[in-house]
Amino acid sequence: MTLTAQDLVAEAKQRIQEIDVAAAQQRLSSALLLDVREPAEFAAGHLPGAINIPRGLLEFKIDSHPDFQGRRDVDIVVYCQTGGRSALATRVLNQLGYTQAVSMAGGFKAWADAGLAVD
């Protein structure tokens, strides 16, 4: 059976914890924010304090990033533009041992649409 990108996202969402914008906002004081969008998307606007590691490089860069080294139990809120890439990224992070990683449903778009602060 051949899967589509949407199938992969749906499967990932069944295996991860997904939180809404309000819950993500409540975690800001204690969680790391991980933006898995491309650098140009990040430069155009991102959540304050977010760390940018694009989805395509995540598996290769996460363990060497100073904010994540030796911190597999840290709370991580992962987001992308609308929630698909962040679901896939969160699934991978969980598989890599980052068990407290969660995906923000709706992504950057939902955050901005809620009128919340962006850099």
Task: Show where each model-derived region lies.
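Rhodanese-like catalytic fold shared by cysteine-dependent sulfurtransferases
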Residues: M1-L32, P39-V77, G84-D119
